[in-house]
């Protein structure tokens, strides 16, 4: 089968990330084989290629926002039948036995495996996964509208839950790409009286935010007239969230939704002032991975509220260009690879 492969760690280039012919996955007990229709593009793929979130092994097929058709089932599979529409996200497997798993925090399991990082992912014509970590989807939905829900949407939803926001309080979103544009749409449903402010350096992202219902849009270093109770950051760098930290109301929270941060502007942390930026019981929280419950809840919410992502379709053969666009912030909403 055809698949995009990360061969080695380094700057994004055709030598370490390329389209190749690889063996089709062979399913085992409790596993299903999915013919991949589409796979969402995520900044995590860049983090893997460039070494900030190193894969467990190389070469590896990245990609973790997968939608396709079940074409084979292993022994003891009960949840799926051949022909079903199925999806998979970042959570590939967990141990199911540790204290975190038993408490409903499987995202913190020490044996957590990320799809496309610790197991072969979805930038491929076929993908396999255990049935209990796959999600059955209704026929009739366009796969390209579903793919971004499995990471950008699901983890954005988890970030929103972790923000502790209450209806009527101001929510601030830092960066406005695949995840935060969906957070905006979710927040407008769950917290209808909460103004949503978007902070983005790119003026096109600010215009998009306003067109999708944001109450106000600011440049990254622009002071808002009113201060938010919570900020959700999806940028890959340090400066934006920690510059804006001083504008969070007392008792408020910054939630960082990123698997890693780049080192380019790490020295900005030296500018932090305890009194100005951290005092008054402000909190900083990070999002680590995702649970199946997050994805299930989010899919139900999206279906009920008729939320759809903004997305651009990219041919499978142009995955390299899609990641280049993401790296250079030339993207509107989410980007989705069309494979089969």
Enumerate the predicted regions with their spans:
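Glycine-rich beta-strand-centered segment in the early N-terminal region that forms part
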Residues: 23-39, 52-99, 133, 138-140
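NAD(P)H dinucleotide-binding glycine-rich loop of Rossmann-like/cofactor-binding domains
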Residues: 94-174
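C-terminal hydrophobic helical "lid"/dimerization subdomain
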Residues: 200, 292-340
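Mid-domain Rossmann-like dinucleotide-binding core that forms the NAD(H)/NADP(H) cofactor-binding site
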Residues: 139-221
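A short acidic, Gly/Pro-enriched loop at the edge of an enzyme's catalytic core
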Residues: 223-231
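Glycine-rich phosphate-binding loop and adjacent beta-alpha segment
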Residues: 238-308, 339-340
């Amino acid at each position: 089968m055809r698949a995009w492969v990360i061969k080695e760690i380094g700057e994004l280039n055709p030598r370490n990330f390329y389209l190749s012919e690889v063996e089709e996955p062979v399913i085992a007990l409790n596993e299903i084989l999915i013919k991949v229709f589409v796979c969402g593009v995520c900044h995590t793929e860049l983090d893997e290629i460039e070494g900030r979130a190193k894969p467990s092994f190389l070469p590896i097929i990245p990609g973790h926002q997968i939608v396709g058709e079940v074409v084979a089932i292993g022994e003891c599979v009960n949840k799926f039948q051949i022909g079903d529409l199925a999806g998979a996200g970042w959570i590939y497997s967990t141990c199911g036995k540790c204290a975190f798993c038993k408490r409903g925090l499987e995202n913190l399991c020490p044996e957590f495996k990320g799809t496309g990082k610790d197991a072969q992912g979805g930038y491929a014509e076929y993908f396999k996964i255990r049935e209990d970590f796959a999600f059955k989807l209704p026929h009739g939905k366009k796969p390209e509208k579903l793919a971004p829900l499995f990471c950008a949407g699901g983890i954005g939803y988890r970030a929103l839950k972790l923000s502790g926001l209450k209806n009527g309080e101001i929510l601030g979103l830092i960066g406005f790409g695949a995840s935060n544009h969906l957070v905006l749409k979710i927040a407008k449903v769950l917290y209808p009286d909460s103004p949503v402010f978007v902070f983005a350096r790119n003026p096109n992202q600010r215009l998009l935010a306003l067109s999708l219902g944001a109450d106000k849009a600011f440049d990254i270093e622009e002071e808002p007239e009113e201060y938010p109770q919570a900020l959700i950051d999806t940028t890959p760098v340090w400066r934006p969230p920690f510059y804006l930290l001083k504008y969070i109301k007392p008792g408020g929270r910054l939630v960082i939704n990123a698997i890693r941060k780049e080192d380019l502007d790490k020295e900005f942390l030296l500018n932090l002032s305890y009194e100005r930026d951290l005092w008054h019981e402000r909190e900083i929280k990070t999002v680590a991975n995702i649970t199946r419950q997050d994805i299930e809840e989010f899919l139900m919410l999206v279906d009920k509220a008729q939320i759809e992502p903004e997305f651009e379709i990219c041919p499978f053969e142009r995955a390299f260009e899609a990641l280049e666009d993401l790296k250079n912030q030339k993207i509107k909403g989410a980007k989705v690879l069309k494979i089969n």
